[in-house]
From Swiss-Prot:
Residues 1-4 are lumenal. Keywords: Endoplasmic reticulum, Glycosyltransferase, Membrane, Signal-anchor, Transferase, Transmembrane, Transmembrane helix. One of its GO terms (molecular function) is dolichyl-phosphate beta-glucosyltransferase activity. This is Dolichyl-phosphate beta-glucosyltransferase ALG5B. The gene is ALG5B. It is found in: Endoplasmic reticulum membrane. It comes from the Eukaryota. Its EC number is 2.4.1.117. Pfam families: Glycos_transf_2.
Length: 333
């Protein structure tokens, strides 16, 4: 009886996989257009990634530099934010306290925080600008429409001034002082290759969570890990933790070549990194689940489809990896 049920479940999974693959193929434009290529759209197109704001005396938007410019600070902290007016103040306060302490201990340490407001409908932008008025290290990159977390991270990292770029979630689920551990690993990796990625990982916490998982959650978890493997990611146990450190050299290839704009962009970055033979490592981090951070079932379905797109389009060579400095220079002259 159990064997029959297992066979039925296997057939169902296979059907879901086939239909999802067909849907992904049919619903996607099969081209090598990346997120940054959209900056070449007309200025009236709301998807255009050219909405950069920072406090200034004349209160006019300021154009950010690009990842292809020389670094101006040691580290950039990119914070994607969508409707985060309530949670982001505590996260920014904690981050500023940590970074200012680092700077007091080492005068050569410099930083910036780029908050990417991804088309928020609340007062996220106003809250961030209030912080920026008293903390010039904070800058706001504002997108007029919601494009997704992946697009927000790509926009922020594409215009970072740091030698090292940390992606960190606005909910503060991962303590900011974990940056020190990722930084240590990054410096080790760069002795081999300047293009490097360090992934914050919650995999060591899985044992604590498994006891509370329902059979459905266990099934979904196993299915997701299978799709991660199919997408081409190997050797990384936790691809989805919102705490990742990138070298500037790696970022010049990662974000200009990114296609996935919503939740499942992380595996694509790792696939791009593997294609470039970057140094990639995983470091355990302290992580606490924050209220309001649960993912919807519809988002999980979309993630599965995006993973199939990554596997198919990168696997077939439709999505390529190349240096796109000319695109940046043309756009920003």
């Amino acid at each position: 009886m159990i064997a029959e049920i297992a066979d039925i479940l296997g057939d169902i999974c296979l059907l879901i996989f086939v239909f999802a693959l067909i849907y992904a193929i049919c619903s996607s434009v099969v081209s090598d257009e990346t997120l940054y290529d959209r900056t070449l759209l007309a200025s009236t197109d709301p998807r255009k990634l050219e909405y950069f704001i920072e406090p200034s005396h004349d209160e006019q938007p300021q154009l950010f530099p690009t990842i292809f410019d020389e670094p101006e600070v040691y580290a950039t902290f990119v914070v994607p934010a969508y409707n985060e007016e309530r949670r982001i103040p505590s996260m920014l306060n904690e981050t500023l306290q940590f970074l200012d302490t680092r700077r007091d201990e080492n005068p050569n340490f410099s930083y910036e925080i780029i908050v990417v407001d991804d088309g928020s409908k609340d007062k996220t932008a106003e809250v961030v600008l209030d912080f920026a008025n008293s903390h010039p290290e904070i800058r706001l990159l504002k997108q007029p429409v919601n494009m997704g977390k992946g697009a927000a991270v790509a926009a922020g990292c594409s215009h970072a001034r740091g030698q090292y770029i940390l992606m960190v979630d606005a909910d503060g689920a991962t303590k900011i002082d974990e940056f020190n551990e990722l930084e240590k690993k990054m410096l080790q990796l760069q002795q081999v290759n300047r293009e490097a990625i360090v992934v914050g990982s919650r995999a060591h916490l899985e044992g604590q969570d498994k006891a509370n998982r329902t059979p459905i959650r266990k099934f979904l978890g196993l299915s997701f890990h299978l799709l991660i493997l199919l997408s081409g990611v190997r050797g990384i146990n936790d691809t989805q933790c919102g705490f990742k450190l990138f070298s500037r050299e790696a970022s010049r290839y990662l974000f200009p070549n990114q296609h996935i704009e919503r939740w499942c962009f992380d595996p694509e970055l790792l696939v791009i990194g593997r294609k470039r033979k970057m140094q990639i490592a995983e470091v355990p981090v302290e992580w606490n689940e924050i209220e309001g951070s649960k993912m919807k079932v519809t988002s999980m379905i979309k993630m599965a489809i995006d993973l199939l797109r990554i596997a198919l389009f990168h696997g077939m060579g439709i999505w390529t990896v190349k240096l796109k400095q000319a695109v940046y220079d043309q756009e920003l002259i």
